[in-house]
Amino acid sequence: MQSATFAKPLWQTYLLFLAPMVLSNFLQSMSGTVNSIYIGQMLGTQALAAVSGMFPVVFFFIALVIGLGAGAGVLIGQAWGARETHMVKAIAGATLLLGVLIGLVAAVLGTVFARQALTGLGTPADVLDDAVDYAHVMLWILPSLLVFVLFTQLLRGVSDTLSPLLALIVSTTVGLALTPALIRGWLGLPPLGIQSAAYAGLAGNLSAMAWLAWRLIRKGHPLAPDREFFAALRLDRVILGKVLRIGLPTGVQMIVLSLSELVILALVNQHGSQATAAYGAVTQIVNYVQFPALSIAITASILGAQAIGAGHLQRMGPILRTGLLINVCLTGGLIVLGYLLSHWLLGLFLTEDSTRAMAEHLLHIMLWSLLVFGFQAIIGGIMRASGTVLVPVVISIVCVVGVQLPAAYWLDGQFGLQGVWMAFPVAYLGMLILQTLYYKLVWKHQKIERLI
């Protein structure tokens, strides 16, 4: 598989890797969007506002696992490029076990402090009780979600983006079929109201993981849950040290982004539940553009790691340039569609005209800047492939904490709710400028070596 990867034209390798991952992100976003439509249309705007308040809280815990998976993905990519299958299993086993422990801790702590967290976020009083009820269920099913997210990241390290896509199809189909049935109590099921989407998501995740295990075993996949894989499920200090060296800064970055979203949400909540519902709707649309941009960056990082593992360092530059070009075509195209279809898209899950008009205006302010976000993410992804993460992460954190948040507060005071969204382009432009300078002036002059 490795030799075939390097024998193909780079653009073809990119697209074969990227296409299933982008489709996976679309499915994931679609699942969240359709669930929001179900809740908004069947339970009302207040219910949607209650669910929207959980987005940053769940993302806070997912950020830890995303960081862990990013570190493991680089190491697995290098080991896979060097054709060291035993090392691939060892890295995956140690990382997955740590991910399980994180999920259990997140479930306990998150459930205990759910009300305090949502109150601290300034969740509107008229939706607080519903938000807490939803949070309790969502956090208890979080371990299964985290394991699923982490395992799909590990699969990508060995260039398998098709299996995660097929598993997500299973998860999405089950979840979307169950959500309205649980909301209304169809087919003899108990009517669970606002908690329906969470329970349906749990059923979908468990179904997908069972199907994925069957598929990997049947295909003799290097990450199949067989005897050798379970033997590798141990907390190897050496491996985890290297995983955390790359993954921890990435996790910290994701947490800072999560915390920044909490601050943004707190600012939005000050404008009332209508603004909170608009925030949730805008987030859904933004996900359709931002996740594909991140997928391009992940692809660049994995392909770069495999090139390093195989000793093909001359491919690093072309991998970066191809990623930037695909970002222009794919992310840019989605941005254009977002502007053209924003009124119709937002109307899918916002029933009040005033709320939809507010959300449309906010979306138009920042949607274009996701192209800039994609550029900086791809540059950072290439550097991450070699294990260079600390400075790119610091750049991102400085731009979020030192630029975006102060700008959001100041612009909120000057322009009201729309000022909060004006801060996003400012931060993304800062990230792109600083990441590019570090790449050109420092990283390109460093010696690149395998990490494992």
Question: What is each stretch, according to the model?
Answer:
Residues 69, 138-157, 164-172, 197-213, ...:
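Short runs within selected transmembrane alpha-helices of multi-pass transporters and secretion channels
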Residues 5-43, 56-71, 75, 100-107, ...:
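N-terminal transmembrane alpha-helices
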